UniProtKB/Swiss-Prot annotation:
Membrane topology: Peripheral membrane protein
Protein name from the UniProt record: Synaptic vesicle membrane protein VAT-1 homolog
Naturally occurring in which organism (per UniProt): Mus musculus
Entry GO MF terms: oxidoreductase activity; zinc ion binding
UniProt entry keywords in alphabetical sequence: Acetylation, Cytoplasm, Membrane, Mitochondrion, Mitochondrion outer membrane, Oxidoreductase, Phosphoprotein
Chain spans, region Disordered: 1-57
Length: 406
């Protein structure tokens, strides 16, 4: 970060602290993800408030904006004027230091994610940074706090205002990059394995896309339970890393039928199938289950076959979508579950309880987010390509500046 921007940020924090909660505007949930326009209004504007003078010389704030559905070029780097933070009641404003890239962001770019607000919109479901201002009624956060954020969208920008209830204090030893890699992947993996899967000693688990963000989180969480057998699918070049991280039986899905391979090793199947793929793979996972086993589907990665929406892939995935009757479940003693973190944004206590457990596991040294790569906003297309082409091992991150901030 340049000395000029550091000075500007310090001035912004000072101005926000003096202004306090009285500067709130009461923006709604979707407001943080909609970057303000930079055009000058035709009507005369009132003179700036005294507190605005501290940031009058601040450089514009940069944000990534999804301008249309399609390929990598649809996410553009734009800027907006730097104005004094004005969080509304129950909100806070933070300077973003790192943000996570998830499959939902890739699907959103192609128009396949229904939780994305209308375009143009700043994507990004998670991030981490420093609080610069708090709104009325926020008593458990203050300027200077380091927080990680889980939000519907809007995190891919230098400064963002979010509901305080969707922020979590970072452990002292955690870096901003680790914090930006924790929430989506580890909440998903934890709830799939423990809340739905009821993972216990002696169980066996199939982890698809085991080298991805959720996959690596799941491997670490499986190691917190004794004697868990893990089958992990990934390309052959990633198998050594998978073995080092607890995969008992890595499977190259490019060259091997994972169903046949698992049946050879474990004829009765597995106890838990983590399914981020959808389509025909959900059915395969169901038929791999032991009695009392569970398949938990939490994604539709099979929809993504390239940088742009593929109608044939969509038709194939939906045509092969798995269905089962209650009678069939009863007779097989199996369960099919669905998980979508985006639809738990109203379940504050539930999510908080999971984050509390994850932070405890981090502090105890049991989990630690694996970072694949860190990309500046200018290279967002390269970051998305890295993930879309499944070249990553662990989490892909974005940072506002050209240098990594910790």
């Amino acid at each position: 970060m340049s000395a000029e921007r550091e000075a500007a940020e310090a001035a912004t924090v000072a101005a926000a602290t003096e202004a306090g909660a009285e500067t709130g505007t009461g923006a709604g949930e979707g407001a943080p993800s909609q970057p303000p326009t930079v055009e000058v209004a035709s009507d005369p504007q009132p003179p700036p408030a005294p507190e605005a003078s501290a940031s009058a010389s601040a450089p514009p704030l940069r944000c990534l904006v999804l301008t249309g559905f399609g390929g990598y070029d649809k996410v553009k780097l734009q800027s907006r004027p730097a104005v004094p933070p004005a969080p509304g009641p129950g909100q806070l404003t933070l300077r973003v230091r790192a943000c996570g890239l998830n499959f939902a962001d890739l699907m959103g770019r192609q128009g396949l994610y229904d939780r994305l607000p209308p375009l143009p919109v700043t994507p990004g479901m998670e991030g981490a940074g420093v609080v610069v201002a708090v709104g009325e009624g926020v008593g458990d956060r203050k300027a200077g706090d380091r927080v990680m954020v889980l939000n519907r969208s809007g995190m891919w920008q230098e400064e963002v205002t979010v509901p305080s209830a969707q922020t979590f204090l970072m452990p002292e030893a955690m870096t901003f990059e680790e914090a930006a890699a924790l929430l989506v992947n580890y909440i998903t993996a934890y709830m799939v394995l423990f809340d739905f899967g009821n993972l216990r000693p002696g169980h066996s688990v199939l982890v698809h896309m085991a080298a991805g963000g959720v996959g690596m989180a799941a491997l670490q969480l499986c190691r917190t339970v004794e004697n868990v057998t893990v089958f992990g699918t990934a390309s052959a070049s990633k198998h050594e890393v998978l073995k080092e991280n607890g995969v008992t039986h890595p499977i190259d899905y490019h060259t091997t039928d994972y169903v046949d391979e698992i049946k050879k090793i474990s004829p009765k199947g597995v106890d838990i199938v983590m399914d981020p793929l959808g389509g025909s793979d959900t059915a395969k996972g169901y038929h791999l289950l032991k009695p009392m086993g569970k398949v938990v589907t939490y994604g539709m990665a099979n929809l993504l076959t390239g940088p742009k929406r593929n109608l044939m892939a969509m038709a194939r995935t939906w045509w092969n979508q798995f269905s089962v009757t209650a009678l069939q479940l009863l007779q097989a003693n199996r369960a099919v579950c669905g998980f979508h973190l985006g639809y738990l944004d109203g379940e504050v206590e539930l999510v908080n309880s999971v984050v509390t457990r994850l932070v405890a596991l981090y502090n105890q040294g049991h989990i630690k987010p694996r970072i694949d790569s860190v990309w500046p906003f200018e290279k967002v297309a390269d970051a998305m390509k890295q993930m879309q082409e499944k070249k990553n091992i662990g989490k892909v991150l974005l940072v506002p500046g050209p240098e990594k901030e910790t």
